[in-house]
Amino acid sequence: MKISKRQQDIYEFIKSEVKEKGYPPSVREIGEAVGLASSSTVHGHLARLEGKGLIRRDPTKPRAIEILSLEDEAETPNVVNIPIIGKVTAGMPITAIENIDEYFPLPEYMAAGETNVFMLEIDGESMINAGILDGDKVIVRQQSSAINGEIVVAMTDENEATCKRFYKEANHFRLQPENDALEPILLNNVTILGKVIGLYRDIR
């Protein structure tokens, strides 16, 4: 089967990412790796690779590229698409489509066997003392209660999902940042969306 040098580079990059991380790269990452600035050009090469039976794509999902001739496919971890939530609509289930920004292909083992999980991308440095950095994605098990001191994702008065350490105190709830420069959030009522059970960080 004849493919171009560029298509070979793209195919090898996808294969190496799947083997190393357990999930495929994004179109942007593919473009950066092979020197293509146009996402439409990358899509064109992917379409040709798919037409030649080397990959299979799911157009309804991001990053959904499957290598069809990966020799050690049995060793590749299973991937689950985890919803990444953004602004939370009050009164809606946390994983309602209105709340989901995108889906992230997480290796199944990182979900720790949990089925009701979602992810939240951390914006800012409010949890740096807990080792949670700006740009990290926390893995969250859905639950509506927490024990004092647990790291949770809760809803603020502005309907934004925030990651903080939870405390129930005498007359209020305290959402405590893990950053000495920031003040806690004090609330009369709090809606807990889930408990943080893991973290994903892209070190590139």
Swiss-Prot record:
**Single GO BP term:** negative regulation of DNA-templated transcription
Its UniProt entry gives the catalysed reaction(s) as:
Hydrolysis of Ala-|-Gly bond in repressor LexA
Q: What is its EC number?
A: 3.4.21.88
* Top-level taxon of origin: Bacteria
Its Gene Ontology molecular function terms? DNA binding; serine-type endopeptidase activity
Catalytic residues, chain numbering: 126 (for autocatalytic cleavage activity), 164 (for autocatalytic cleavage activity)
Q: Specify the protein name.
A: LexA repressor
Annotated source species:
Listeria monocytogenes serotype 4a (strain HCC23)
Which gene produces this protein? lexA
